[in-house]
Every structure is written in structure tokens, then in C-alpha cells.
A protein has these predicted regions:
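Transmembrane beta-strand segments of Gram-negative outer membrane beta-barrel proteins
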Residues: 26-35
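Bacterial Sec-dependent N-terminal signal peptides
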Residues: 1-27
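N-terminal targeting signals for Sec/Tat export/insertion, comprising classic cleavable signal peptides
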Residues: 37-55
């Protein structure tokens, strides 16, 4: 009889202690998926604070994103983040690496996030009519403004806007973003 009570109590105690250790973490690091924003269309990112003892303040972010643009007419130039697709092509594939310095303001679960960085891009332009693809490599400067929620158990929600900057010709394109992940 004692063994049948002892094991469930030991299991309950272990689960309680594990739950306390998760909620006691400072959540200064996070991994999350992102739609749009600096990931361009879809991506996965890692974010951390320079001061690992606190879940707010100055930090950095990097990741890997993927973007795609298509036009049914090769005579129409597509606008995609930092410029226009060459007229002879009607599809663009983009691999993107966002690099950002950011700041989280707030000490509770809800924080305001702001940042500045560059998206390092490798673009591949293709056409349905054939021909050799064209490649380009570059960087797009951007800002980031948004809201970040981190629950006690580590669930992370991010939402905001990323103004992308282009300099030839000068223009600002706004991309919303939505992210879900885990803070630890």
C-alpha cells in the first residue's frame, strides 16, 4: 500500500519542481518562427539579451528566412522589399538572414520591442519561358517596432511592423510581422 502511494506522490513532487524551474527562468533567450517582417515571408529566428540575467534591455537577433514573389506577366515589374524584379523575369526566390540589434522595454510579461538591422539577401530570378536565371546579393536596412508577450511557461508571441528602407530610389515599405515561439 505504501509503495502505491509513494510513487504518485514522488511523480507529483517532481512535476511541481519542474514547473517551478520553468517559471523561475528569466527568458533572456528565445527561438521563434516568423511570418513576413524581416524574415521576408517565413523564417526561424534566435534572439538573446546581452545581459543574460534579465529578460529585457539590449539584445540581438539572427535567423534564416525565405521569400517568394510571382507575376503572371513578365511585362510587370514586381515590387519586393528592396527593389523591383527585372522585367524579363516573373519569379523571385529569396534567402534572407536578418541581423538585428534590438531593445526590449518593460519588465513584465508584455514588452515593447524596437530594433535596427540589415537583412542579408540572396535572390534568384527565373522565368517561366526559360533562359538562364539571374542572381543578386545585397542587404536591406530595416527598423523593427512591435509588441512581445512571454508567458510564465515560456510561450512567446510577437507582433509589429518592419519598415524596410530602399535607397535607389528612396522609399520605405512597411511589412507586418507575427511570430510564435519559445523563450527560455
Amino acid at each position: 500500500m505504501e509503495k502505491s502511494i509513494f510513487m504518485p506522490l514522488l511523480l507529483a513532487l517532481g512535476l511541481s519542481l519542474a514547473g517551478l524551474s520553468v517559471s523561475a527562468q528569466n527568458h533572456s533567450k528565445s527561438v521563434y518562427g516568423e511570418l513576413l517582417g524581416a524574415s521576408q515571408m517565413i523564417g526561424v529566428n534566435y534572439d538573446a539579451r546581452f545581459n543574460r540575467a534579465v529578460p529585457y534591455g539590449l539584445g540581438w537577433r539572427t535567423g534564416l528566412g525565405f521569400g517568394y514573389a510571382y507575376s503572371s506577366s513578365s511585362a510587370v515589374a514586381l515590387s519586393f522589399a528592396d527593389g523591383e524584379m527585372p522585367v524579363a523575369y516573373n519569379r523571385m526566390f529569396r534567402f534572407a538572414v536578418p541581423l538585428e540589434i534590438n531593445y526590449l522595454l518593460g519588465k513584465g510579461k508584455s514588452k515593447f520591442e524596437s530594433g535596427a538591422g540589415a537583412i542579408v539577401c540572396l535572390d534568384r530570378f527565373t522565368s517561366e519561358t526559360g533562359g538562364a536565371p539571374e542572381h543578386s546579393f545585397g542587404a536591406i536596412p530595416y527598423l523593427s517596432l512591435g509588441y512581445r508577450l512571454v508567458t510564465d511557461n515560456g510561450f512567446l508571441l510577437r507582433a509589429g511592423a518592419v519598415p524596410l528602407l530602399s535607397f535607389s530610389p528612396f522609399r520605405v515599405s512597411f511589412y507586418p510581422y507575427l511570430g510564435f515561439g519559445w523563450a527560455f
